């Protein structure tokens, strides 16, 4: 839901934060992380003026930077703690990664487009984020050498249950992912029960680009 265009970035950010609270993003740590992450750093020049809209925007390689509400909702659903090691599937612009880095100990993030990964790494350097570890690779495979993770966030739609990723989660960890084969998917929260099983909660309907196997040439 895009709010009216603001006259200044400061006014835009203020309106965006109010919109997020109204839609149910209420975790103080998550709100602070979003407020301190300059979204305009992650948006292409063509869309700079729309950086503070609550809407998804196109980026390179046919991908998108997610709607801030979805970033807030997914981050909040992870129930992060400062000690958490987080795996993110799909770095994209790096915006979601940067938000995660402000509410967790370490963020491991995988991107299949080398172009996007390099651009995101440059943005992390600008922000001085030293707790983000990047990898160029197939996100669907996860990062077995660094597993298990406290939390896993998937930022592209999985057509089936993300079993390979669930196997890299700690027994009482949490994974949040959009799952579905059509243009509209269900955002699901998998919570480990400590015994090898999971409880699954459907949070809402979402629209994400699909997870693709392998790595890209770009």
UniProtKB/Swiss-Prot annotation:
Disulfide bridge partners, by residue number: none
Gene Ontology annotations for the cellular component aspect, listed alphabetically: cytoplasm
Xref: SUPFAM superfamilies: S-adenosyl-L-methionine-dependent methyltransferases (SSF53335)
Pfam families in the record: PCMT
UniProt EC number: 2.1.1.77
Annotated compartments: Cytoplasm
Keyword Metal-binding annotated: no
Major place of residence: cytoplasm
Top enzyme class: transferase
Family as reported in the entry's similarity comment: Belongs to the methyltransferase superfamily. L-isoaspartyl/D-aspartyl protein methyltransferase family.
Protein name per Swiss-Prot or TrEMBL: Protein-L-isoaspartate O-methyltransferase
Source species: Caulobacter sp. (strain K31)
UniProt lineage: Bacteria, Pseudomonadati, Pseudomonadota, Alphaproteobacteria, Caulobacterales
């Amino acid at each position: 839901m895009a709010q009216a265009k603001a006259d200044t970035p400061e006014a835009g950010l203020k309106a965006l934060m109010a919109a997020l609270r109204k839609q149910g993003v209420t975790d103080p740590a998550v709100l602070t992380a979003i407020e301190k992450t300059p979204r305009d750093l992650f948006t292409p020049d063509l869309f700079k003026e729309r950086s503070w809209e609550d809407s998804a925007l196109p980026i390179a390689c046919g991908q998108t930077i997610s709607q801030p509400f979805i970033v807030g909702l997914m981050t909040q659903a992870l129930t992060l703690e400062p000690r958490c090691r987080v795996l993110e599937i799909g770095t994209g612009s790096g915006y979601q990664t940067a938000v995660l880095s402000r509410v967790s100990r370490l963020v491991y993030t995988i991107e299949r487009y080398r172009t996007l990964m390099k651009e995101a790494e440059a943005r992390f350097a600008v922000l001085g984020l030293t707790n983000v570890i990047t990898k160029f690779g197939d996100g669907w495979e996860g990062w077995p050498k660094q597993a298990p993770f406290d939390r896993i966030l998937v930022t592209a739609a999985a057509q089936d249950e993300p079993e390979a990723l669930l196997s890299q989660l700690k027994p009482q960890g949490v994974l949040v992912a959009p799952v579905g084969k059509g243009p509209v998917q269900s955002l699901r929260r998998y919570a480990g029960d400590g015994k090898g099983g999971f409880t699954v909660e459907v949070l809402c309907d979402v629209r994400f680009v699909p997870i693709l196997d392998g790595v890209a040439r770009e």
